[in-house]
Amino acid sequence: MSGLLVIGDVVTDVVALHDGPAATGTDTPADISLRPGGSGANTASWAARLGADTRLLARAGYDTGEWHVAQLAKAGVRPHLRIDPERPSAVVIAMVDSTGERSMLTNRGASGHIGVGDWTPDLLDGVGHLHLSAYTMFAEPGLELARLAMREAAERAIPISVDPASCGPLRAFGTERFLRETAPASVVIPNLDEALLLADAADPEASARTLSAHYGTAVVKLGAGGALLARDGRIVARAAAPPVDVVDSTGAGDAFAAGFLVASMAGSTPEEALRKGCEAGMAAVAQVGARPDPGNFTLLTPIAGLRRKLHH
């Protein structure tokens, strides 16, 4: 199986798990941990865990850049990270409630300044698939990088997939503009809200059909409802999500993308690839943090017994 190149972001995740609603103007008890994250880096880490030869192109800051490089290498990823000497790494504060749902406060930091200067054509040597996190595209330097990478991948007949990232920045960027800029991609992997927004549709099936008519293949992530896949305007596969006790939903979609892409690159059927994606996504939500092997990460507070405390 040829390699996977992911272009995306690395983020320092501050994950705060709290049992009840956050109290305004006073303290709310929480278990807080510091972990490596970022949509692109998460997908790359899960893909490496699943056996793919994976490299990541990203930009990190002067403060935690070397830590991010080390964490990616621990995960089996070949990191191609430029350390920005003037900017800190991106930071996300993820507030996770007792159901596993999260709300996020975001500072893009160095990740918002990745650009064509970070690119070299040899990044595509030995690569069988290019995957883009759309977070990279929402700032002009990253958009120029995405255009360049997709153009060079297309010239080498390397298939391209894109994850639309998040409804907020996607809406600000413009859905028609996004569809136009990502036209070289043959696979799009949105969650349900992103799919409905991009397709201007009312249900998952309609959105998948519409998006697959544009890209060729659309994979719509449905969370606990599993996933479905459409090709050329027709639903061709579905998969159910395995049951799991949800601890933290951060990174579930990134893990799904990794499972789906690695299985697809290995020649799996659409049904098998969806199932592998769902399995990876469920593995992600059963733990704290967005990457595999949480025991390898630096913790600010212990999380032993966390599930017991959350569901007490």
Identify the function of each model-found stretch.
Residues 54, 79, 160-161, 218:
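Hydrophobic beta-strand scaffold residues
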Residues 123-125, 182, 212:
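A short, aliphatic-rich alpha-helical micro-motif
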